[in-house]
């Protein structure tokens, strides 16, 4: 909700893909949620997704320019990095915010 407000605000959906592909999938419901304990901090429900372990990363696709503009430091959470991916080009647009930048 603080990182990506669009699903809570507009009901938008974004593709979610694993950062590292594994080939073991679970045929059960997966709910992707954010770190805030709010009922609207949900991104997507999927019926089939690969198995994930603690600290595995996923990519929320096609967030666009409004993703960071609508983000906040709600609950003293730092803002994520912005990464542009275009075919084989991967570029860090802004680095992950550090706590000492907001205190």
How should each PLM-predicted stretch be described?
Residues 1-103:
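Charged (often Lys/Glu-rich) extended helix/loop segments that serve as interaction or gating elements
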């Amino acid at each position: 909700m603080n990182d990506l407000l669009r699903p809570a605000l507009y009901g938008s959906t974004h593709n979610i893909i694993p950062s590292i592909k594994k080939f073991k999938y679970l045929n059960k419901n997966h709910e992707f949620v954010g770190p805030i304990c709010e009922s609207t901090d949900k991104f997507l429900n999927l019926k089939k997704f690969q198995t994930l372990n603690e600290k595995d990363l996923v990519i929320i696709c096609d967030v666009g320019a409004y993703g960071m503009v609508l983000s906040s430091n709600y609950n003293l959470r730092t803002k994520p990095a912005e990464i542009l991916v275009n075919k084989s080009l991967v570029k860090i647009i802004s680095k992950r915010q550090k706590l000492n930048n907001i205190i």
